[in-house]
From Swiss-Prot:
<dbReference type="GO" id="GO:0009437">
    <property type="term" value="P:carnitine metabolic process"/>
</dbReference>
<dbReference type="InterPro" id="IPR023452">
    <property type="entry name" value="CoA-Trfase_CaiB"/>
</dbReference>
<dbReference type="InterPro" id="IPR023606">
    <property type="entry name" value="CoA-Trfase_III_dom_1_sf"/>
</dbReference>
<protein>
    <recommendedName>
        <fullName>L-carnitine CoA-transferase</fullName>
        <ecNumber>2.8.3.21</ecNumber>
    </recommendedName>
</protein>
<dbReference type="InterPro" id="IPR044855">
    <property type="entry name" value="CoA-Trfase_III_dom3_sf"/>
</dbReference>
<dbReference type="GO" id="GO:0005737">
    <property type="term" value="C:cytoplasm"/>
</dbReference>
<keyword id="KW-0963">Cytoplasm</keyword>
<feature type="active site" description="Nucleophile">
    <location>
        <position position="169"/>
    </location>
</feature>
<comment type="function">
    <text>Catalyzes the reversible transfer of the CoA moiety from gamma-butyrobetainyl-CoA to L-carnitine to generate L-carnitinyl-CoA and gamma-butyrobetaine. Is also able to catalyze the reversible transfer of the CoA moiety from gamma-butyrobetainyl-CoA or L-carnitinyl-CoA to crotonobetaine to generate crotonobetainyl-CoA.</text>
</comment>
<dbReference type="GO" id="GO:0008735">
    <property type="term" value="F:L-carnitine CoA-transferase activity"/>
</dbReference>
<comment type="pathway">
    <text>Amine and polyamine metabolism; carnitine metabolism.</text>
</comment>
<keyword id="KW-0808">Transferase</keyword>
<feature type="binding site">
    <location>
        <position position="97"/>
    </location>
    <ligand>
        <name>CoA</name>
    </ligand>
</feature>
<dbReference type="InterPro" id="IPR003673">
    <property type="entry name" value="CoA-Trfase_fam_III"/>
</dbReference>
<comment type="subunit">
    <text>Homodimer.</text>
</comment>
<dbReference type="Pfam" id="PF02515">
    <property type="entry name" value="CoA_transf_3"/>
</dbReference>
<comment type="similarity">
    <text>Belongs to the CoA-transferase III family. CaiB subfamily.</text>
</comment>
């Protein structure tokens, strides 16, 4: 198979990935593949472009490195072109409501007739099967968080709160990426493809698993705490200093002993409530948990972030300043690792945003292209799978494809 014009780089060079999906979750999986060197084809509706395009800046990050194909994949010759594309595809990712592709006649079995080795990743809010009440419902970040038990665990003691920005979408996209790569490994070993059913709510169920295990195995549910504190452990979570916020984790025998001396609680050490060798102070089970929080709050409020960081470094207590977004690009760690980078958009503008992650030493990722325009690569992709200029124009004339103006 000849590939589309693009530089060869990254650990996934030579891999062809196709995705159909809008907004964030499914496309984030495609973004990861594209930044790691795969040839990634982004399918958009012919009449209406991906709704993400209305955002002024984010699409330049989320759709960089992609090849844009505008094709009606469910109708007549457009469907035929899509199935022909599948013959040369390694991984196909679709994000929709439940078994939307199967309902429109594109089942796993149809795809495997054209490519027995194809890895298919279905990403939806509630999965490909289940009850009629849920399976076909639309889902976004907050829906998946609410249905999974994740949202109810977060927020303030008086009110739950979803995690932003769009946590469930990103976790689900990463799950699609890793699952598809696992399936590809097996498909190349056996010659038999795989179909993956990724339900966003199940992804978030796993993300919220830590505290849930106490309920499932004893009936006790961890309460939400106020002001960003850890629900279980004192000295862990968000705290306010004289000039801003830090997060800290008071974990370890020596760390607790030295911290207690600083905040005036040394007399509690080696007591029945806080015996020698204590590594964590349980906020609920330890009767002194509230007192530890009170004293720690007072001590931190009397010191600047710089003073706290210096002292905690001496005590080997993990902590970090809560950075504002404007502080990121000047932070020395960000600068040293080039965590924020720049690239050129298709119209020649400079765009700034997060760099590729993670960092591969021997086969690094690369930003080689900005976000393509709607239908920009339709002709090149169709020619790549054997279509002539006349074939392409016929698809366009029937409203089944869109090429760049």
């Amino acid at each position: 198979m000849d590939h589309l014009p693009m530089p060869k780089f990254g650990p996934l060079a030579g891999l062809r990935v196709v995705f159909s999906g809008i907004e964030i979750a499914g496309p984030f999986a495609g973004q990861m593949f594209a930044e790691w060197g795969a040839e990634v084809i982004w399918i958009e509706n012919v009449a209406w472009a991906d709704t993400i395009r209305v955002q002024p800046n984010y699409p330049q990050l989320s759709r960089r490195n992609l090849h844009a194909l505008s094709l009606n994949i469910f109708k007549d010759e457009g469907r035929e072109a899509f199935l022909k594309l599948m013959e040369t595809t390694d991984i196909f990712i679709e994000a929709s409501k439940g078994p939307a592709f199967a309902r429109r006649g594109i089942t796993d079995e149809v795809l495997w007739q054209h490519n027995p080795k194809l890895v298919i990743a279905h990403l939806s809010g509630f999965g490909q099967y289940g009850t009629e009440e849920y399976t076909n419902l639309p889902a976004y970040n907050t829906i998946a968080q609410a249905f999974s038990g994740y949202l109810i665990q977060n927020g303030d003691v008086d009110q739950p709160m979803p995690a932003f920005p769009y946590t469930a979408d990103y976790f689900s996209g990463l799950t699609a990426t890793t699952a598809a790569l696992a399936a590809l490994h097996k498909a190349r070993e056996t010659g038999k493809g795989e179909s993956i059913d990724i339900a966003m709510y199940e992804v978030m169920l796993r993300m919220g698993q830590y505290f849930m295990m106490d309920y499932f195995n004893g009936g006790e549910m961890c309460p939400r705490m106020s002001k960003g504190k850890d629900p279980y452990y004192a000295g862990c979570g968000l705290y306010k200093c004289a000039d801003g916020y830090i997060v800290m984790e008071l974990v370890g025998i020596t760390q607790i002993e030295e911290c207690f001396k600083d905040i005036g609680l040394a007399h509690l050490l080696s007591t029945p409530e806080i015996p020698e060798g204590t590594q964590l102070i349980h906020r609920i089970e330890c009767p002194y948990g509230p007192l530890v929080e009170e004293k720690l709050d007072a001590w931190l409020a009397a010191h600047t972030i710089a003073e706290v960081k210096e002292r905690f470094a001496e005590l080997n207590i993990a902590c970090a300043k809560v950075l504002t977004v404007p502080e990121l690009e000047s932070n020395p760690q960000y600068v040293a690792r080039e965590s924020i980078t720049q690239w050129q958009t298709m119209d020649g503008r400079t765009c700034k945003g997060p760099n590729i992650m993670p960092k591969f030493k021997n086969n690094p990722g690369q930003i080689w292209r900005g976000m393509p325009s709607h239908g920009m690569d339709t002709a090149a992709i169709l020619k790549n799978i054997g279509y002539s200029e006349n074939d392409i124009q016929e698809l366009v004339s029937k409203g089944l494809a869109k090429v760049e103006d």
